[in-house]
């Protein structure tokens, strides 16, 4: 099993698909990586030679930010927006949609489950 960027790639899938198991690599970047590393995209992961795995690993390390580094950069970017106090930062802080979507209806994913109506407790019956 090939291990690239701390991720075990599935053996039976084509390398083009296997690379997409790494956070930060999608279809397009997987194709570009394989093109730069001179590896056929239809090769199965189990059929890769050690040299091909090394070339893929080096290409990813040099050209693409993946896994922990990418996650860290994204969280720092969001934190920076919140520290600035700009509109996008405030929306992140409040847990609301950031990109201009409506919130009167919808946006349940960002806002969380509905807060139910809290009704007053029924008043006890007056004593006779």
From Swiss-Prot:
GO terms for cellular component: cytosol; small ribosomal subunit. Keywords: Ribonucleoprotein, Ribosomal protein, RNA-binding, rRNA-binding, tRNA-binding. InterPro entries: Rbsml_uS13_C, Ribosomal_uS13, Ribosomal_uS13-like_H2TH, Ribosomal_uS13_bac-type, Ribosomal_uS13_CS. SUPFAM superfamilies: S13-like H2TH domain. Residues 95-118 have a biased composition (Basic residues). Residues 95-128 are annotated as: Disordered. Pfam families: Ribosomal_S13 (PF00416). The keyword Phosphoprotein does not apply. The keyword tRNA-binding applies. GO terms for molecular function: rRNA binding; structural constituent of ribosome; tRNA binding. One of its GO terms (biological process) is translation. Transmembrane segments: none annotated. NCBIfam families: uS13_bact (TIGR03631). Belongs to the universal ribosomal protein uS13 family. HAMAP family: Ribosomal_uS13. PANTHER family: 30S RIBOSOMAL PROTEIN S13/40S RIBOSOMAL PROTEIN S18 (PTHR10871), SMALL RIBOSOMAL SUBUNIT PROTEIN US13M (PTHR10871:SF1). Located at the top of the head of the 30S subunit, it contacts several helices of the 16S rRNA. In the 70S ribosome it contacts the 23S rRNA (bridge B1a) and protein L5 of the 50S subunit (bridge B1b), connecting the 2 subunits; these bridges are implicated in subunit movement. Contacts the tRNAs in the A and P-sites. Part of the 30S ribosomal subunit. Forms a loose heterodimer with protein S19. Forms two bridges to the 50S subunit in the 70S ribosome. This is Small ribosomal subunit protein uS13. The lineage of its organism: Bacteria, Pseudomonadati, Myxococcota, Myxococcia, Myxococcales.
């Amino acid at each position: 099993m090939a291990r690239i960027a701390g991720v075990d790639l599935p053996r039976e899938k084509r390398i083009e698909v296997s690379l997409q198991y790494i956070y930060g690599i999608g279809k397009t970047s997987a194709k570009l990586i394989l093109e730069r590393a001179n590896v056929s995209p239809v090769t199965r992961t189990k059929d890769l030679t050690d040299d091909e795995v090394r070339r893929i690993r080096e290409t990813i390390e040099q050209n693409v930010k993946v896994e922990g580094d990418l996650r860290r950069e994204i969280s720092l970017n969001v934190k920076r927006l919140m520290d600035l106090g700009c509109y996008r930062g405030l929306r992140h802080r409040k847990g609301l949609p950031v990109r201009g979507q409506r919130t009167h209806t919808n946006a349940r994913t960002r806002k969380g489950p509905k807060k139910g109506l809290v009704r007053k407790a029924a008043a006890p019956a007056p004593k006779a």
